[in-house]
């Protein structure tokens, strides 16, 4: 990238006026547009990231030209790829490869001045005439800045650079108008709290509280995508706290604010919500690098940490002596997790994995009191399957006791169990464990046709294999016949 001294508008904070790196491809595109007497400006996230000294991998531009006018220019520039899925919104995209093999992707949109239907967040697309008018329809001032190319004039009509320097999220126009036009902007606000560590300006925050119910018109997929981006950020806790405080969570993840009403059974935390936030942070800290078993950021682990205790409100019971219990909250929580993630249209594989982690998150606790037999360890690994590494991290993250002795006992037990698993894996491949007699042999030995009894017999023999390890085939056959005589012939 090339380094330039930008020409700043008067409203730009002195704290952010310095040298910035600009993609040479942006300058080149600007010259191509200028030759045809069209305006072109880098806008939104790439400009914000430039001021934060972050690298943007995709470049967004807006222009005075209509799509049919700038399409030939873009096709000529982006000789390695072109797409027009956003044509009806005035957007075309292109890609080119550099000599080093890296790709530069750009999307260019005609200036917009949209009209919104109050019953939908989808605007009636109308083209605008000025860059400033286009910037006024953007979500927040920190995203309503532009850099004209090729002359590198910085355009900031709403004080976005100043807000960026202060770490504040504010809308370019009245926040109620902005959120009424596009309610998803409220979700984007809390997502930026997580991604950028910003705070929401008071008037903007008040508008979110008042208008959270407008999110009801937003599709589940859009809500899911914002939640995902927030959870995969560096500071998801800040975003989740803003989600709850603003009332948005009540509309999109009601199980989370419900945790604020529940007192932790050990009275270690202000409420279960606080405990959940701590578990999430601890789980993130246990993620690995890209070469490890749980590469960061891991959406499955983070969702499981967020949802692992949502069954507590429905299972709360007041015991003698003022104690509170939440028996079977793991099972209840797993059912609630599946229902919520399905409502948000998450991928079914992810739903299965997160649900199973919530279901199993208490499984290890019995080991602390009394170490398991080898068969119990095998069963733990077999039952957790491909989620074994994630389950161990969720289990460790969930151990938030402030009692130093208990904490050390738990960590020692977890370390011991993991070492035992390593030793047992040297003896056999847990993922390949099967009964010593398969389904076909079961039917042959017991003279059965395919049916439920064959399935029950297979499950029994798998349990027997887990409990006893590998045994001689004759012993396995004897066990099968014994089980059949005692269970099915009574």
Question: What are the functions of these language-model segments?
Answer:
Residues 1-490:
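Catalytic cores of the polymerase beta-like nucleotidyltransferase superfamily
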């Amino acid at each position: 990238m090339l380094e330039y001294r930008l020409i700043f508008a008067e409203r730009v904070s002195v704290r952010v006026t310095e040298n910035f790196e600009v993609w040479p491809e942006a300058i080149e595109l600007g010259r191509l547009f200028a030759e045809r007497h069209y305006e072109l400006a880098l806008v939104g996230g790439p400009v914000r990231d430039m001021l934060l000294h972050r690298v943007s991998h995709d470049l967004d531009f807006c222009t005075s030209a209509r799509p049919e006018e700038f399409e030939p220019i873009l096709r000529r520039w982006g000789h390695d790829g072109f797409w027009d899925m956003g044509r009806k919104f005035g957007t075309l995209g292109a890609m080119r490869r550099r000599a080093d093999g890296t790709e530069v992707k750009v999307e260019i949109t005609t200036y917009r001045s949209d009209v919104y239907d109050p019953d939908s967040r989808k605007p009636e697309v109308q083209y605008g005439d000025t860059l400033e008018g286009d910037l006024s329809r953007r979500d927040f001032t920190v995203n309503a800045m532009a850099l004209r190319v090729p002359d590198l004039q910085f355009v900031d009509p709403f004080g976005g650079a100043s807000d960026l320097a202060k770490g504040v999220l504010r809308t370019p126009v009245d926040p109620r108008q902005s959120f009424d036009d596009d309610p998803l902007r409220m979700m984007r606000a809390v997502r930026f709290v997580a991604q950028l560590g910003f705070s929401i300006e008071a008037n903007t925050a008040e508008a979110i509280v008042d208008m959270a119910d407008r999110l009801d018109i937003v599709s589940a997929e859009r809500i899911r995508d914002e939640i995902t981006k927030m959870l995969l950020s560096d500071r998801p806790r800040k975003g989740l706290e803003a989600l709850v405080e603003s009332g948005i969570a009540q509309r999109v993840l009601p199980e989370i604010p419900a945790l604020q009403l529940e007192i932790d059974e050990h009275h270690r935390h202000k409420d279960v919500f606080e405990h959940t936030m701590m578990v999430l942070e601890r789980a993130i800290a246990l993620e690995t690098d890209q070469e490890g078993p749980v590469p960061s950021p891991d959406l499955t682990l983070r969702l499981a940490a967020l949802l692992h205790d949502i069954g507590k409100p429905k299972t709360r019971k007041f015991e003698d002596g003022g104690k509170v219990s939440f028996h079977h909250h793991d099972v209840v929580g797993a059912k609630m997790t599946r229902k919520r993630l399905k409502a948000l249209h998450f991928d079914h594989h992810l739903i299965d994995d997160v649900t199973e982690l919530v279901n199993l998150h208490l499984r290890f606790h019995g080991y602390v009191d009394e170490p398991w037999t080898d068969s119990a360890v095998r069963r733990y690994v077999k039952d957790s399957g491909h989620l074994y590494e994630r389950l161990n991290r969720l289990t460790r993250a969930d151990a938030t006791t402030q009692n130093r002795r208990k904490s050390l006992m738990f960590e020692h037990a977890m370390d011991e169990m993991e070492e035992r698993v390593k030793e047992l894996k040297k003896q056999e491949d847990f993922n390949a464990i099967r009964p010593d007699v398969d389904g076909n042999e079961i039917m042959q030995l017991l003279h059965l046709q395919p049916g439920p009894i064959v399935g029950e017999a297979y499950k029994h023999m798998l349990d027997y294999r887990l409990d006893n390890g590998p045994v001689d085939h004759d012993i396995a056959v004897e066990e099968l016949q014994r089980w059949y005589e005692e269970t099915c012939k009574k």
